[in-house]
């Protein structure tokens, strides 16, 4: 089957925002106007097309990034609706990795919110071009120009309106297009009847002022336009649009639009902007990867003629078709029934069927082309971030970075029958979500699950009960602490057993030094002259890795330590891998006496929004929880406080804040970094973990 839409006419976009800014409603309207659905589903009524998991419909939030495809103005638009809640950051990250552009949805009353900052930062890291949609213009307190200013103040973004609203709150009735310099007036509730007319007299001065600002801002990014502007020449609409497109694709400029998805206003113009200003796969740099055979960098330009290369960005278990692997095709063509090579795992995989997804309904297709996003059935070994390529033309594409979990819970099955089911359920959920970890405590036999926050684990335990019918008891949440060394030291590990039978002998000298934060464990072999034979070196490293998994103070994993093996000795007969593994673990224990071991705790960036009258209470909460205030901002008669607070002190805070502010205060938190716990807290943790 031939390609239906050319690469120039393909857009892969994400819709991202702070929780509750109206992302899913916006996506719903896009599907409605592009003819994908005939009846609009409201998120707050639990009937949205994109939020198809039961928990999403109950909670009114988006958890998984549903992928869907739509058509607009002769173009194919593949849309990924991403969650706005911080506990589901990985969903945002992995969708940004495979998108070419994004629409950032703001709540026009609140402007840039904490999670907007997080997703904006992630999109900047991945170099994703964006347009901004100031939604909820019909809401009380909606302020378009405040929202635009918040993009400058909080994100330092070169963002400028290409539209202005006509009226706001209940009186929001249309939009001024600053490129055509025309007004679009909505005359019915479905937003399908739009009158284009001259700009109302009372808005002409404002429109001229913002048109001038727009031209100036765009000219700053474009030399040719700047020359025309300075010489006072007329700049045509076509020239202005072309310059906005170039600057947006180069991530130098962000067009800002306005509307109300709920009231069906502004969505079609936003779709036009997706086509006009966001890139096709041909507009962005060709993806790079490493050839596993030569270790050399290779590129894969977006073209059907190139060898097939794709990235798996999400695994999902579908009750009807089983395991689905979502993938983005960067180059080449793939037919169902053919074989590909998973270069990340070195395994050959058969593509059973290829499905094009629409939220949770699906359509089977025979072929996918460069630039497409689809799901495959039948892949057994592929996980998030794996590269799938032509067997004859291997390449490993840059993978998806997975943040470390910060919170853990103990789960135990209620009955023997639940035990086996729970193992399978947890394995499947972990396959779908790389930030969800499942471990078994070797000493107690307990199953411990870890994730990005309480809501994250709540949803997963809930899915285990609903989808896999597993009944389980869940313990109280625990913090994922870490351990490290704060000083350098040298230590010997000597292990000798020679009492009848085959003896054991291992002897090592290791220098331990603190590593940079986030660098993890690094091992260096500095042995000269074979005092420790080469075949035992990996055993020394393995011995250290295994011992570090259980720490030296309270049994927490050790991070950010360098170990340099520089001396030792061996016995011709009695030395073995096991002996050197044990010797290495003894060296670590010995080092702990003088390397100033410390326990680290996750610090959260907490953003608390509360009425001004309650500011004193909020500051008191932060101090009482060992937190430190990082900044404050007044918004009308509310105060926004940003602070770093240990995760251990944040359990149950929602209830405290609610009662202190009569339910008017809210907070968001996102993991920021690890920090040493105070000595008194460290002693308590050690005491608790040694069972005293």
From Swiss-Prot:
Keyword Protein biosynthesis on entry: yes
Localization: Cytoplasm
Domain (tr-type G) ranges: 8-282
Keyword line: Cytoplasm, Elongation factor, GTP-binding, Nucleotide-binding, Protein biosynthesis
GO biological process: ribosome disassembly
UniProt xrefs under InterPro entries: EFG_II, EFG_III, EFG_III/V, EFG_IV, EFG_V, EFG_V-like, EFTu-like_2, G_TR_CS
GO MF terms, alphabetically ordered: GTP binding; GTPase activity; translation elongation factor activity
Record-level GO cellular component terms: cytoplasm
SUPFAM superfamilies xrefs: EF-G C-terminal domain-like (SSF54980), P-loop containing nucleoside triphosphate hydrolases (SSF52540), Ribosomal protein S5 domain 2-like (SSF54211), Translation proteins (SSF50447)
Statement: the UniProt record of this protein carries the keyword Protein biosynthesis: yes
Sequence positions that bind GTP: 17-24, 81-85, 135-138
A matching Pfam family: GTP_EFTU_D2
Protein family according to the UniProt entry: Belongs to the TRAFAC class translation factor GTPase superfamily. Classic translation factor GTPase family. EF-G/EF-2 subfamily.
Functional summary from the UniProt entry: Catalyzes the GTP-dependent ribosomal translocation step during translation elongation. During this step, the ribosome changes from the pre-translocational (PRE) to the post-translocational (POST) state as the newly formed A-site-bound peptidyl-tRNA and P-site-bound deacylated tRNA move to the P and E sites, respectively. Catalyzes the coordinated movement of the two tRNA molecules, the mRNA and conformational changes in the ribosome.
Protein name: Elongation factor G
Organismal lineage: Bacteria, Bacillati, Bacillota, Bacilli, Lactobacillales
């Amino acid at each position: 089957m031939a390609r239906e839409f050319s690469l120039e006419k393909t857009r892969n976009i994400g819709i991202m925002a702070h929780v509750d800014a109206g992302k899913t409603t916006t996506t719903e309207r896009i599907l409605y106007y592009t003819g994908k659905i005939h009846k609009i589903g409201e998120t707050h009524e639990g009937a949205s097309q994109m939020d198809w998991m039961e928990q999403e419909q109950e909670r009114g939030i988006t958890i998984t990034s549903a992928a869907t495809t739509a058509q607009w103005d002769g173009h194919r638009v593949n849309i990924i609706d991403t969650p706005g809640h911080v506990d589901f950051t990985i969903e945002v990250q992995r969708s940004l990795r495979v998108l070419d552009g994004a629409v950032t949805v703001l709540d026009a009353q609140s402007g840039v919110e904490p999670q907007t900052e997080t997703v904006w930062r992630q999109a900047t890291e991945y170099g994703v071009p964006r347009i901004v949609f100031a939604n909820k213009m019909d809401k009380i307190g909606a302020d378009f120009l405040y929202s635009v200013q918040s993009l400058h103040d909080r994100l330092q973004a070169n963002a400028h309106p290409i539209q202005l609203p006509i009226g706001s709150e209940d009186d929001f009735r249309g939009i001024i297009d600053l490129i055509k310099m025309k007004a679009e007036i909505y005359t019915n509730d479905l937003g399908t009847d739009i009158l284009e007319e001259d700009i109302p007299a009372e808005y002409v001065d404002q429109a001229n002022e913002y048109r001038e600002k727009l031209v100036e801002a765009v000219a700053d990014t474009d030399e040719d336009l700047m020359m025309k502007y300075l010489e006072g020449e007329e700049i045509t609409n076509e020239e202005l649009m072309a310059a906005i497109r170039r600057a947006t694709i180069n991530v130098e400029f962000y067009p800002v639009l306005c509307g109300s998805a709920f009231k069906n206003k502004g969505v079609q113009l936003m779709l036009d902007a997706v086509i006009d200003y966001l890139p096709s796969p041909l507009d962005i740099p060709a993806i790079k990867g490493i050839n596993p055979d030569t270790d050399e960098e290779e590129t894969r330009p977006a073209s059907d003629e190139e060898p097939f290369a794709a990235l798996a960005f999400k695994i999902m278990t579908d009750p009807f078709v089983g395991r689905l692997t979502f993938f983005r095709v960067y180059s080449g063509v793939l037919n169902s029934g053919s074989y590909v090579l998973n270069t990340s795992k070195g395994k050959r995989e058969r593509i059973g069927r290829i499905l094009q997804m629409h939220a949770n309904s699906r359509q089977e297709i025979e072929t996918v082309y460069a630039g497409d996003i689809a799901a495959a059935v039948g892949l057994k070994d592929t996980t998030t971030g794996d590269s799938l390529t032509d067997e004859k033309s291997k390449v490993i594409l840059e993978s998806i970075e997975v943040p470390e979990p910060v919170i853990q819970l103990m789960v135990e099955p209620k009955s023997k029958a639940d035990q086996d089911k729970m193992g399978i359920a947890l394995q499947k959920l972990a396959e779908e979500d790389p930030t969800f970890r499942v471990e078994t405590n070797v000493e107690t036999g307990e199953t411990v699950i870890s994730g990005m926050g309480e809501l994250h684990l709540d949803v997963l335990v809930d899915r285990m009960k609903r989808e896999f019918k597993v009944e389980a008891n869940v313990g109280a949440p625990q913090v994922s602490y870490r351990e490290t060394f704060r000083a350098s030291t040298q230590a010997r590990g000597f292990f000798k057993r020679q009492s009848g039978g085959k003896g054991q002998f291992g002897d090592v000298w290791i220098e331990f030094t603190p590593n940079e934060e986030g660098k993890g464990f690094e091992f260096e072999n500095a042995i000269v002259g074979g005092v420790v034979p080469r075949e035992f070196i990996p055993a020394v490293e393995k011995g250290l890795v295994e011992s570090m998994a259980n720490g030296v103070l309270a049994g927490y994993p050790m991070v950010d330590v360098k170990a340099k093996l520089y001396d030792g000795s061996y016995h011709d007969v009695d030395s073995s891998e096991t002996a050197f593994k044990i010797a290495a673990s003894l060296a670590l224990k010995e080092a702990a006496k003088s390397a100033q071991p410390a326990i680290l705790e996750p610090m959260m960036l907490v953003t608390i929004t509360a009425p001004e009258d309650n500011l004193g209470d909020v500051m008191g909460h932060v101090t009482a929880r060992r937190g430190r205030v990082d900044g404050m901002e007044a918004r009308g008669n509310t105060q926004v406080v940003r602070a770093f607070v240990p995760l251990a002190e944040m359990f149950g805070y929602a209830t405290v804040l609610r009662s202190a502010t009569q339910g008017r205060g809210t907070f968001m938190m996102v993991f920021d970094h690890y920090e040493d716990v105070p000595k008194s807290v460290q002693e308590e943790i050690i005491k608790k973990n040694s069972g005293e």
